Design a protein with these regions (language model features):
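Conserved NAD+-utilizing ADP-ribose enzyme module
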Residues: 1-33, 55-56, 76-189
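Extended catalytic/binding region for NAD+/ADP-ribose chemistry, centered on the ART fold
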Residues: 52-77
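Short aromatic-glycine-(Arg/Gly/Cys) micro-motifs in beta-strand/loop hairpins
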Residues: 30-55
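Short, charged/polar surface micro-motifs in flexible loops or helix N-caps
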Residues: 42, 67-70, 95-99
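Compositionally biased, intrinsically disordered low-complexity regions
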Residues: 40, 60-62, 135
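Short His-Asn-centered micro-motif
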Residues: 37-39, 63-65, 91
């Protein structure tokens, strides 16, 4: 019941309300969170070694709380490669105190520096099992690229980013984190 309410509620909220909703769930005693992953590849088991490099939060397995966003990821990957299919995976994330979780509630200086480090150096530049926060996507990429190229200062970039509509992402970086991510279903889209 709670999961259905979560799914229905998130599609009616703006991004700030969505982030607050995710934060409220994370702060509960035994939270579970429904997550979605979009891909052009059908798989049964997550392999962190197949993760792409130089992503916002480092090499990892990326999900979102928004099913529509996962649909868009699947479509984009399929159009880019013209291989496989279009799949959306539905997972249940069971948070645990044993996990080190970093949560970015907004597009701020700390988020921007974190993304810069992971995108420029590559691999994983942190010690978190799970990272939650905004996506540097089509809406924000121009500003992020200008910052990465040292054309904008961090303060100028953060000011510009405040006006962007953003989506969210939840990334899993360790085998321990994946133990708390349970596959519920996979569907063709």
């Amino acid at each position: 019941e709670k999961i259905l309410v979560q799914h229905e509620t998130l599609h009616q909220l703006d991004i700030h309300d969505t982030f607050q909703y995710v934060e409220d769930i994370i702060e509960e005693d035994t939270p579970t969170l429904v997550l979605f992953h979009g891909s052009n590849i059908a798989f049964d088991k997550i392999d962190l070694n197949k993760s792409h490099n130089r992503r916002d939060f480092g090499r990892g397995f990326y999900c979102t709380v928004l099913e529509q966003q996962a649909n868009e990821w699947a479509n984009r990957l399929y159009l880019r490669t013209h291989t496989g299919g279009k799949y959306v995976y539905r997972y249940i994330f069971q948070q645990s105190e044993e996990l080190k979780i970093k949560h970015f509630a907004t597009l701020d200086k700390e988020w921007l520096e974190f993304v810069k480090l992971n995108r420029t150096v590559g691999d994983i530049q942190h010690h978190y099992d799970v990272v939650i926060g905004p996506v540097a996507d089509d809406n924000t990429m121009e500003t992020v690229q200008l910052y990465l190229s040292d054309i904008l200062s961090v303060d100028e970039a953060v000011t510009r980013l405040r006006y962007n509509k953003v989506n969210n992402q939840v990334s899993f970086h360790t085998p321990l984190a994946l133990e708390h991510l349970i596959l519920e279903s996979r569907k063709d889209v």
